[in-house]
């Protein structure tokens, strides 16, 4: 039975968000680094740093906090395509989340990217997750 690293990222961020923790520690792989870069660029997390611990690399992500209250933003992440059921879409049928307010992360032939980037480049791919 294989590991689903994308589901691990989503679960870690969701659990830290519900538990009102400020940071999340995620095992570092190429896929996780690309997804965390997208989350950082889109403003869902504040800061990311790479941490080495006994020959293993981890990404330590700081969740985005509200200015008025000290709790983190409620970020909803949903895994779509999974190892048992892959979901693919062409660029014209990529769903829009909350009318464009949320993002869809796709795995394409040109790497992992958001739905906006995939539409601009005119390529589809595997729908990894929704974030809003």
Curated annotation (Swiss-Prot):
<dbReference type="GO" id="GO:1990904">
    <property type="term" value="C:ribonucleoprotein complex"/>
</dbReference>
<dbReference type="GO" id="GO:0005840">
    <property type="term" value="C:ribosome"/>
</dbReference>
<dbReference type="GO" id="GO:0006412">
    <property type="term" value="P:translation"/>
</dbReference>
<comment type="subunit">
    <text>Part of the 30S ribosomal subunit.</text>
</comment>
<dbReference type="GO" id="GO:0009507">
    <property type="term" value="C:chloroplast"/>
</dbReference>
<dbReference type="GO" id="GO:0019843">
    <property type="term" value="F:rRNA binding"/>
</dbReference>
<comment type="function">
    <text>One of the primary rRNA binding proteins, it binds directly to 16S rRNA central domain where it helps coordinate assembly of the platform of the 30S subunit.</text>
</comment>
<dbReference type="Pfam" id="PF00410">
    <property type="entry name" value="Ribosomal_S8"/>
</dbReference>
<keyword id="KW-0689">Ribosomal protein</keyword>
<dbReference type="InterPro" id="IPR000630">
    <property type="entry name" value="Ribosomal_uS8"/>
</dbReference>
<dbReference type="InterPro" id="IPR035987">
    <property type="entry name" value="Ribosomal_uS8_sf"/>
</dbReference>
<protein>
    <recommendedName>
        <fullName>Small ribosomal subunit protein uS8c</fullName>
    </recommendedName>
</protein>
<keyword id="KW-0694">RNA-binding</keyword>
<comment type="similarity">
    <text>Belongs to the universal ribosomal protein uS8 family.</text>
</comment>
<keyword id="KW-0687">Ribonucleoprotein</keyword>
<dbReference type="InterPro" id="IPR047863">
    <property type="entry name" value="Ribosomal_uS8_CS"/>
</dbReference>
<keyword id="KW-0150">Chloroplast</keyword>
<keyword id="KW-0934">Plastid</keyword>
<dbReference type="GO" id="GO:0003735">
    <property type="term" value="F:structural constituent of ribosome"/>
</dbReference>
<keyword id="KW-0699">rRNA-binding</keyword>
